[in-house]
Curated annotation (Swiss-Prot):
Chief location category: cytoplasm
Pathway involvement of the protein, from the record: Cofactor biosynthesis; coenzyme A biosynthesis; CoA from (R)-pantothenate: step 1/5
Molecular functions per Gene Ontology: ATP binding; pantothenate kinase activity
Top-level taxon: Bacteria
Keywords, sorted A to Z: ATP-binding, Coenzyme A biosynthesis, Cytoplasm, Kinase, Nucleotide-binding, Transferase
Catalytic activity: (R)-pantothenate + ATP = (R)-4'-phosphopantothenate + ADP + H(+)
Positions of ATP binding: 95-102
Family: Belongs to the prokaryotic pantothenate kinase family.
InterPro entries associated with the record: P-loop_NTPase, PanK, PRK/URK
NADP is among the record's keywords: no
Protein name: Pantothenate kinase
A cellular component term, taken from the record's GO annotations: cytoplasm
Length: 316
């Protein structure tokens, strides 16, 4: 059986951080420190150097790929003699809880929107497509929140298929991390973006991951370019615990927070609680459902200590 390294060598071009940084060429840095501060996630130390070395080359690559897709579309339309509706280029970002998917998505949204070829870039998280809390309780899935079966896949696929078909207006449900539930009286309006970034735990899943006898489309069927943010599990668990401690003194202190009871834990209790949540929910979900989809990504961002990217793998 081939090792993981052999598989990566066969499928991907590997770039060390310094090698990848050289591919930026002359792409300017358009973010400043205050703007970057607004994009950072909890407990992340993302710097302008990280943006310059990792995200600017990625922004350049994606701009070239999107441009090639747009040109191909023009050629095809001329050949067919038609003018179809505007279809956004769809980028997915997958990875574990606490790996920094949301920050990666926000940074790419900010950078890609600076290119004149595709100024309108929308970002949607799959959190809004989780079943409402009452439905999760009814199905006995509250302790499996984040697992594939906890998502309303019919709604999610309907949303992304409408986007792919060029629908001029599509609504995405929103999620509240305070109430730990879908927001019922508001939504996100998506109106013909040039690029749509969709970020979530399971966006790389395919029919291979479905139960036997299940036939349904998946998000990955509609995605043009996929990114997986990767890190070793011991780092992910540490980052999750660190983030839990940050939330305990921040978001959890809100009396309206679903997790307000955690705000009363001392350091030792909080670390034990977070570790137990990881070991019983997030860790198993990573091993069973998320990590097995990694090598389907077009690009893998590998993180080391302090959330810094150490290597980039680009599919051949």
């Amino acid at each position: 059986m081939k090792s993981e390294n052999q598989i990566h060598t066969a499928l991907y071009l590997a770039f060390q951080r310094s090698q990848w940084a050289e591919l930026r060429e002359s792409v300017p840095l358009t973010l400043n420190e205050p703007e970057l501060a607004n994009l950072r996630g909890i407990n992340e130390k993302l710097s302008l150097t990280e943006v310059t070395d990792i995200y600017l080359p990625l922004s350049r690559l994606l701009n070239l790929i999107v441009g090639a897709k747009q040109k191909r579309g023009l050629v095809l339309n001329e050949f067919l003699g038609r003018k179809p509706p505007k279809r956004p280029y769809i980028i997915s970002i997958a990875g574990s809880v606490a790996v920094g998917k949301s920050t990666t998505a926000r940074i790419l949204q900010a950078l890609l929107s600076q290119w004149p070829e595709h100024p309108r870039v929308d970002l949607v998280t799959t959190d809004g497509f989780l079943y409402p809390l009452a439905e999760l309780k009814r199905r006995g899935l509250l302790q499996r929140k984040g697992f594939p079966e906890s998502y309303d896949m019919k709604l999610l696929v309907e949303f992304i298929s409408n986007i792919k078909a060029g629908a001029p207006y599509v609504e995405a449900p929103l999620y509240s991390h305070v109430s730990y539930d879908r927001i019922t009286d508001d939504h996100q309006a998506i109106e013909s973006p040039d690029i749509l970034i969709i970020e979530g735990l399971n966006v790389l899943q395919t029919s291979q991951d479905a139960a036997v006898g299940t036939q349904q489309p998946f998000v990955s069927d509609f995605v043009d370019f996929s990114i997986y943010v990767d890190a070793q599990e011991q780092l992910l668990k540490k980052w999750y615990i660190d983030r839990f401690l940050q939330f305990r003194g921040g978001a959890f202190s809100d009396e309206n927070s679903y997790f307000h009871h955690y705000s009363k834990l001392n350091d030792k209790e909080a670390k034990i609680t977070a570790a137990n949540i990881w070991d019983s929910i997030n860790g198993p979900n990573l091993k069973l459902n998320i990590e097995p989809t990694r090598d389907r990504a077009h690009l893998i961002l590998q993180k080391g200590d302090d959330h810094l990217m150490s290597q980039v793998l680009l599919r051949k």
